[in-house]
Amino acid sequence: MKDDNFIKENNAKHLWHPMGHPADSLINPPKVIVSAQNSSIADVDGHETIDAVGGLWCVNLGYSNDAIKETISKQLYELPYYSGFAGTTNAPAIEASLAVREMFEEDGMSRVFFTSGGSDAVETALRLARQYHRLRGEPNRTKFMSLKKGYHGTHFGGASVNGNNRFRINYEPLLPGCFHLPSPYAYRNPFNETDPA
């Protein structure tokens, strides 16, 4: 890896950071995170802080968890990757799907569909909902309702049902038939009701 000065000098020059305009990233360069342990992260200048968003996607068990590192390392030597697409699968996917299904057995889950993240999961759920109604002979059931301020990802469908304008308005028009309802938040009371139910 290049030295810290090179990293700082090239920060935001070639990488388009999510949720920001490239020119803004040049004026206010993103913090460069260089290491992490448990729930703490450290930047290129040595400042350490708690990662209160959990890496946003994938570190709910903390950074540098030894059991996870060992499992990943072992798997990289056996089979680093293979798709479960078009008639193939792999043993870790089968084992993981059984473990997830067993966790949700009392809810009636019978199958698991793995995705690479939350946005992919929302896209898949939207497509499955459409397919479900089409197969039941109700192809016109195409509307989606979600809560204002709710976050549902950044892909096309996810942004469409996203209740947070920041992730939606710059890309509209998006998927038609998406409606955003006020959250049932008694403190702010968007319904102007006195009944707490």
Outline where the language-model segments fall.
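PLP-dependent aminotransferase-class I/II
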Residues: 148-197
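Short solvent-exposed loop/turn micro-motifs enriched in small/polar/acidic residues
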Residues: 32-35, 107, 164
